[in-house]
């Protein structure tokens, strides 16, 4: 495997999202200065080298190559076959072209035989072809044939798209086909229009060097030829002229690209004339110079346009491949798909069985042998035979279900899961094989890795990642060697991964790990076995510190000078890398992973933002205090975990995944793997060392496994929500057309009505009539007001006239607002009053129709193209009528963007776009294949053909290819066998789709004796079962075996089907058959399990393609309410508070309306007017909006009763639909937070109270930020006294230290006479004062004086911390042997100063903190009255600390001296 073939895999990186918090200015309560701000930072790894840092960017590419197998290649490799193209006379046409994916002769014979068809002989086939229009020629066919012509199968083989590039003369297309048929004038007219439109796509003069006159002449000639074509009539057998016209309009006539071909012909002729002599010479030398690059769509159109229309090279390959299109898309990027070893196939069966079994909820003692067999069969059908879900479920059901009647059946949901799991398994196997190859290249033998690859049950990607990380960690040097040996460049880069560990392992310190008494590999085996297979052996004489001391004093310690003065750092380093070895050990990780997956629970930890923002009505309300949630909880409510993840991404909460009693679990693992029972001091210290390393390692593994579980749980929950969305959408699709009379199941004539905005009298009412063929006939505009009290009969008569003229079987209605409900009731009243009945004498039903499709259609591009001159409401009504005829087709004609906008499931927003569309597509596939597609109807009905893409085996590309192939037939399809004989479908696609593509039986077709027209072509019976169906029919008719055998020899078994269809007692005869016994006999003789197929045969012989969908579902009750108002149970419920606009008054009652149009009634007892004994109109105003509480909802009349009383509005009722069981809800934390919220609410109330007024010249009515704004333009030392947010017993002083630097000082008041009075005792920083003036003089003015003293000192430097550090560093470089120190403001903590210093140029920069008090400067537990004393004290401290601590190990860390 070359490096280019291996795909790169990025290692997973865990990131800690930190929430940025903005806080209000804080009151400085730190009096003693013992809580100084810290700038401590973590030091660099002692084994990181500058050499690695310099090469980091360069080496990253090489390091990445090692991991590149962990993402499957997205680009499929494939070669392009060169086609041999030969010129032939323009007066001749090729006899026939063969497709790349066409069946060979043996396959064709076998398939035709299994399907019950008789394949025509070569002469018969030639005769058939002679009566048809010839196919369009390819560009390459214009080249001359050589003397020694190659076989036709090699020369004529080409892509179906080549038919677009025909160079044949236009007159040839008008040739008669022997039956007198020629293209219709109208159809050609439309085709020419399409061609003209395509001509505008690229301007002609950009591709031509001819002069203007020649160009005009050529265009005129082209136009003349087109006009000749328009003058000739056309008729296509079996299709009406209108249908032919529609077909031409949709598909064109194949001449859309003539302009490009004419251009190429002209250029090629010129080129051939100029080079004829050279070609002759080259031909004499045996060189074929006539080969030329064939013009392709890529040469004509922009790539983006080709992608949009699915015409790229990849798209064409998908069209040609004999694999279902959905499978091809799903398997994109998978190498060597379907080439698993027998062991891997068995492994896949068990792996998928375990996953599907969870959904089946089998009992613990259930025998899964038969279940696994069914899973294996399904995998074989999907992977080896490329059969789609719909086919498997319909015609292989006995292979995927239990033999017991009450046993399991793998339903469509399970089969779709198997399809996706199969792809995932192949990806895992590919990655496993990559890691194995990678490991073998290293030429090493590691017991852990060898054991993993010998264990055929290991299929989890996480375990595989452990092995890969382990090899990369432990054998970094070997990887480097392999990389170096495979690099041609002598200056190849190093393998960077774990290079610091390699340096540690090569150092003398590694000996200390050997002294621990047990290796990481032995620990892994102990943990895996759950007891000490390898006992720990303590060092007999040395403690950990002694072992390190010996190493540092030994002869190999010359490279360990950094540790010579700091043995503690050396011990910490050893512990760190020992913990790393433990955390990388696959057995340690696998044991913890197994235990975690069995026992993990999920808790939620709120952030301060989440505690504040998640309130009643929030989408995360039910998970705010989630606790102890198990996998079972998430399987029953998968949206819960997805919403947890969503809330975590918004920084509202953190998800914590752990096992219960995790500390005890860690103790248990340590005791069984690393702890010794010795009680000596040496053993205790080694136990302590090992325990610290073990805890560190397990914390890392816990974190990694928690993240793995989070990712796996997310994947599972997404799958379950996707399945739930799929079920909801299938409910919408699984509706038959509306049938008013079930006894006479005819598609109804439909009249649809809408009132638009519902302004009766000013806005017209629109009605649209559609016939039984779903064709728009005409629209009506009713201007009469249906609620006109003076002349109500005007509207009634107008509507009655329309109904009498159209004779509809059903009236459908809907609209955008609740006014539609009034119209609905009015129409029902008119139907009853006028006795408007159908041909059965029943009243014409008036129904509410779901309008979510109509709303999207009315303003769509499709509607504009179909009805460009019609108003929006007419288009809306047309879509309502189409929905009544077929909800399935209405949804199938929506674009992806329109489908994405549908509201299907309450949690669909949790899914990605891809998963949501996947759910919808699988729903379409299941229902469309349940219903089937009439082939000939699809060829001339673009609206109907939209569902073709969902037929088993098809997709967007193959359905388009299928329609193009049918178009080239130029006649209706008469039998399913023609799908094979005419090379329309390839073998696998035919097997998948044939039974779902039906051809209506027509006795007229019997005149074609060259085809075996079978009545079974109009049933759901698969062609492979035709022979079985004839035998069932013969048995039902009770023919004797000899007669059946005779018919079978004569090949006329289909006569039994005709006889049975004509038999009036066929139902009784078919139902009397013992199908179970027949199926058992069939399985015994042939090994085929066909019981389900036999049941299908019986049902289809009774009625072909019987309607299996659920009845049409008109809207009722709350569904109508939701459709007309847009309200749901979450936005409009009993007890909710809504805004109501007053419309009118009546008898002291108030009538209003909500924003969504719901009419509201407020009776006299539910508004304040009754209490005040005043009329409602004196208290409330018309047009004004008031808050109201919903008391009762009348869904039928789209109205409600509400209350305007204040005490009702204050008590809003929000229903709780979740459990607060203490086992899954953190009740204790909720109560604590509620107490905090109460205190905060009280403080906010205090803050909003009447502002205190203190009689003092410096007191101002400010908040903290307002005080800062006030002082911003004033001088240093200025201040204000203000009210404190801490309550009535606090005041605050805000004073200015420097530009944009302010300190807020808290004043606590004692001995208050009342809450608003000033306290007699005032406390600031534990110092008591008797009034504000004393605080100003003794406290504040002293601080201002000391502030001016330090800022005027030469050792004070203005600027930010970074600016001062840069100044000190620069100074130290210029004066390397001098110490330097400076003070500067601490802008993060007003009232504090930084003291930053360096001993010399080589030392680290240290940062201490100094606090400004009213008596001096506080540094390291001592207060210095002046700056001079502060500087002297600093130097004294520095000298004393230097004697005690000469080496500091923290970069830029004040902790090196006195912990600052």
Swiss-Prot record:
Record-annotated SH2 domain positions: 1257-1354
UniProt-listed Gene3D superfamilies: RuvA domain 2-like, SH2 domain, Spt6, Death-like domain, Spt6, helix-hairpin-helix domain, Tex N-terminal region-like, YqgF/RNase H-like domain
Acidic residues: compositionally biased ranges: 36-62, 71-83, 98-110, 141-153, 164-177, 196-212, 268-285
The keyword Transcription is assigned to this record: yes
GO cellular component term of the entry, any: transcription elongation factor complex
Disulfide bonds: none
Entries under SMART domains matching the protein: SH2 (SM00252), YqgFc (SM00732)
Keywords assigned: Chromosome, Nucleus, SH2 domain, Transcription
Biased composition (Basic and acidic residues): 1-21, 154-163
Location within or outside the cell: Nucleus; Chromosome
InterPro entries in the record: RNaseH-like_sf, RuvA_2-like, SH2, SH2_dom_sf, Spt6-like_S1, Spt6_acidic_N_dom, Spt6_death-like, Spt6_HHH
Function: Histone H3-H4 chaperone that plays a role in maintenance of chromatin structure during RNA polymerase II transcription elongation thereby repressing transcription initiation from cryptic promoters. Mediates the reassembly of nucleosomes onto the promoters of at least a selected set of genes during repression; the nucleosome reassembly is essential for transcriptional repression. Essential for viability.
Family to which the UniProt record says this protein belongs: Belongs to the SPT6 family.
Record protein name field: Transcription elongation factor SPT6
Organism listed in the record: Kluyveromyces lactis (strain ATCC 8585 / CBS 2359 / DSM 70799 / NBRC 1267 / NRRL Y-1140 / WM37)
Gene that encodes it: SPT6
């Amino acid at each position: 495997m070359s490096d280019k073939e291996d795909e790169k895999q990025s290692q997973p990186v865990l990131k800690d999202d930190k929430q940025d918090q903005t806080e209000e200015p804080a009151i400085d309560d730190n009096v003693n200065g013992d809580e100084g701000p810290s700038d401590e930072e973590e030091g660099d790894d002692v084994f990181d080298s500058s050499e690695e840092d310099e090469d980091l960017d360069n080496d990253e590419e090489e390091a990445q190559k090692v991991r590149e197998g962990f993402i499957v290649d997205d680009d499929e490799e494939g070669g392009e076959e060169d086609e041999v193209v030969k010129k032939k006379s323009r007066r001749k046409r090729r006899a026939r072209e063969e497709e790349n994916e066409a069946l060979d002769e043996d396959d064709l014979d076998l398939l035709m035989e299994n399907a019950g068809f008789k394949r025509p002989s070569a002469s018969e086939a030639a005769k058939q072809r002679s009566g048809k229009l010839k196919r369009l020629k390819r560009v390459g066919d214009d080249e001359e044939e050589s003397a020694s012509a190659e076989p036709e199968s090699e020369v004529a083989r080409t892509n179906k798209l080549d038919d677009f590039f025909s160079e044949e003369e236009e007159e040839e297309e008008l040739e008669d086909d022997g039956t007198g048929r020629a293209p219709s004038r109208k159809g050609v007219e439309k085709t020419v229009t399409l061609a003209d439109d395509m001509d505008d796509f690229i301007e002609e003069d950009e591709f031509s060097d001819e002069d203007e006159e020649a160009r005009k002449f050529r265009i005129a000639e082209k136009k003349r030829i087109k006009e000749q074509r328009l003058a000739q009539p056309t008729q296509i057998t079996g299709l009406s002229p209108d249908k032919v016209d529609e077909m031409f309009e949709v598909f064109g006539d194949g001449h859309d690209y003539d302009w490009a071909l004419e251009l190429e012909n002209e250029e090629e002729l010129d080129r051939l004339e100029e080079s004829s002599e050279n070609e002759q010479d080259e031909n004499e030398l045996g060189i074929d110079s006539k080969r030329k690059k064939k013009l392709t769509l890529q040469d004509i159109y922009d790539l983006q346009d080709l992608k949009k229309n699915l015409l790229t090279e990849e798209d064409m390959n998908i069209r040609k491949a004999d694999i279902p299109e959905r499978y091809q898309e799903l398997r994109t990027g998978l190498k060597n798909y379907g080439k698993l070893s027998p062991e891997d196939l068995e492994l896949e069966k068990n792996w998928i069985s375990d996953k599907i079994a969870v959904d089946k909820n089998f009992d613990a003692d259930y025998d899964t042998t038969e279940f696994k067999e069914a899973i294996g069969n399904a995998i074989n059908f999907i992977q080896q035979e490329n059969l789609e879900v719909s086919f498997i479920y319909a015609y292989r059901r006995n292979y995927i279900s239990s033999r017991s009647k009450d046993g399991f059946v793998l339903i469509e949901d399970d089969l779709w899961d198997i399809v996706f799991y199969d792809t995932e398994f192949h990806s895992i196997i590919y990655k496993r094989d990559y890691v194995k190859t990678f490991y073998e290249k290293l030429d090493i033998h590691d017991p852990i890795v060898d054991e993993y690859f010998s264990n055929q049950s290991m299929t989890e990607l996480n375990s595989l990642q452990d092995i890969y990380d382990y090899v990369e960690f432990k054998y970094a040097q070997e990887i480097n060697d392999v990389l170096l040996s495979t690099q041609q460049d002598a200056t190849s880069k190093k393998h960077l991964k774990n290079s610091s560990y390699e340096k540690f392992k090569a150092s003398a310190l590694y000996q200390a790990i050997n002294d621990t008494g047990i290796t990481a590999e032995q620990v892994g085996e102990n943990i895996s076995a759950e007891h000490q297979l390898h006992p720990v052996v303590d060092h007999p004489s040395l403690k950990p510190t002694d072992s390190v001391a010996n190493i540092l004093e030994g002869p190999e310690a010359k490279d360990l000078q950094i540790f010579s003065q700091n043995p503690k750092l050396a011990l910490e380093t050893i512990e760190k890398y020992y913990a790393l070895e433990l955390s990388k050990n696959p057995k340690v990780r696998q044991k913890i992973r197994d235990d975690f997956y069995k026992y993990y629970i999920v808790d939620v930890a709120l952030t301060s933002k989440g505690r504040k923002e998640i309130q009643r009505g929030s989408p995360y309300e039910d998970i705010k205090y989630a606790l102890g949630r198990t996998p079972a909880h998430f399987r029953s409510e998968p949206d819960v975990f997805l919403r947890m993840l969503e809330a975590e991404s918004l920084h509202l909460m953190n998800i914590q995944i752990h096992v219960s009693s995790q500390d005890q679990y860690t103790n248990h693992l340590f005791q069984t793997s690393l702890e010794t029972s010795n009680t000596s001091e040496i053993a205790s210290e080694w136990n302590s060392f090992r325990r610290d390393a073990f805890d560190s390692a397990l914390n890392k593994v816990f974190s990694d496994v928690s993240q793995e579980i989070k990712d796996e749980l997310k994947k599972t929950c997404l799958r379950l929500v996707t399945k739930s969305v799929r079920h909801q959408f299938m409910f919408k699709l699984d509706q038959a057309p509306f049938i008013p009379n079930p006894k006479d199941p005819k598609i109804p004539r439909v009249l649809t009505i809408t009132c638009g905005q519902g302004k009766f009298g000013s806005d017209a009412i629109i009605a649209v009539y559609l016939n039984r063929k779903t064709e728009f006939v005409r629209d009506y505009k009713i201007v009469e007001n249906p609620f006109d009290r003076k002349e109500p009969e005007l509207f009634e008569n107008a509507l009655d006239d329309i109904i009498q003229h159209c004779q509809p079987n059903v009236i459908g209605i809907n609209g955008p607002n609740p006014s539609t409900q009034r119209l609905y009731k009015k129409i029902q009243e008119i139907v009853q009053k006028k006795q408007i009945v159908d041909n059965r004498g029943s009243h014409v039903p008036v129904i509410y129709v779901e309008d979510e499709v109509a709303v999207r259609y009315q303003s769509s591009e499709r509607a504009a193209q179909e009805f460009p001159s019609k108003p929006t409401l007419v288009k809306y009504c047309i879509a309502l009528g189409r929905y009544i005829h077929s909800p399935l087709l209405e949804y199938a004609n929506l674009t992806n963007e329109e489908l994405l906008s549908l509201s299907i499931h309450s949690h669909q927003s949790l899914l990605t776009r891809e998963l949501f569309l996947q759910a919808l597509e699988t729903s379409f596939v299941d229902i469309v294949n349940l219903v089937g597609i009439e082939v000939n109807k699809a060829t001339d009905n673009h609206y109907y053909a939209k569902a073709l893409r969902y037929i088993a085996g098809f997709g967007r590309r193959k359905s388009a290819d299928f329609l193009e192939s049918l178009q080239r037939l130029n006649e209706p399809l008469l039998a399913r066998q023609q799908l094979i004989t005419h090379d329309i479908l390839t073998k696998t696609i035919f097997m998948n789709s044939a039974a779902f593509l039906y051809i209506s039986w027509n006795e007229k077709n019997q005149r074609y004796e060259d085809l075996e027209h079978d009545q079974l072509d109009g049933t759901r019976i698969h062609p492979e079962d035709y022979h079985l169906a004839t035998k069932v029919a013969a048995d039902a008719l009770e023919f004797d075996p000899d007669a059946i055998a005779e018919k079978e020899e004569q090949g006329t078994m289909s006569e039994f089907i005709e006889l049975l269809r004509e038999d009036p007692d066929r139902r009784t005869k078919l139902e009397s058959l013992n199908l179970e016994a027949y199926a058992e006999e069939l399985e015994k003789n042939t090994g085929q399990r066909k019981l389900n197929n036999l049941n299908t045969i019986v049902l289809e012989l009774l009625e072909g393609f019987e309607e299996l969908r659920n009845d049409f579902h008109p809207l009722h009750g709350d569904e109508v309410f939701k459709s007309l108002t847009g309200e749901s149970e979450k936005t409009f419920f009993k007890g909710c508070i809504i805004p109501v606009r007053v419309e009118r008054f009546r008898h002291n009652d108030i009538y209003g309306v909500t924003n969504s149009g719901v009419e509201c009634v407020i009776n006299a007892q539910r508004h304040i007017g009754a209490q005040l004994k005043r009329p409602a109109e004196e208290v409330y105003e018309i047009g004004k909006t008031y808050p109201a509480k919903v008391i009762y909802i009348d869904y039928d009349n789209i109205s409600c009763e509400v209350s305007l009383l204040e005490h009702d509005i204050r008590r809003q009722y929000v229903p709780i639909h979740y459990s607060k069981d203490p086992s899954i809800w953190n009740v204790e934390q909720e109560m604590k937070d509620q107490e905090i919220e109460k205190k905060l609410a009280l403080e906010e109330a205090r803050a909003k109270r009447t502002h205190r007024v203190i009689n003092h010249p410096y007191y101002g009515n400010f908040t903290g930020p307002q005080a800062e704004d006030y002082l911003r333009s004033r001088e240093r030392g200025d201040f204000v006294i203000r009210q404190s947010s801490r309550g009535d017993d606090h005041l605050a002083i805000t004073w200015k230290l420097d530009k944009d630097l302010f300190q807020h000082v808290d004043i606590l008041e004692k001995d208050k006479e009342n809450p608003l009075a000033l306290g007699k005792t005032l406390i600031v920083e534990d110092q008591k004062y008797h009034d504000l003036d004393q605080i100003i003089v003794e406290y504040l003015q002293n601080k201002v004086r000391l502030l001016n003293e330090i800022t005027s000192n030469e050792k004070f430097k203005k600027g930010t911390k970074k600016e001062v550090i840069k100044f000190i560093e620069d100074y130290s470089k210029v004066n390397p042997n001098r110490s330097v120190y400076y003070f500067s403001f601490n802008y993060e903590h007003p009232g504090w100063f930084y003291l930053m210093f360096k001993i010399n140029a080589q030392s680290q920069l240290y940062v201490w903190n100094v606090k400004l008090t009213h008596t001096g400067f506080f540094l390291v537990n001592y207060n210095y009255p002046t700056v001079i004393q502060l500087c002297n004290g600093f130097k004294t401290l520095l000298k004393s600390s230097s004697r005690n601590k000469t080496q500091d190990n923290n970069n830029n860390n004040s902790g090196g001296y006195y912990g600052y």
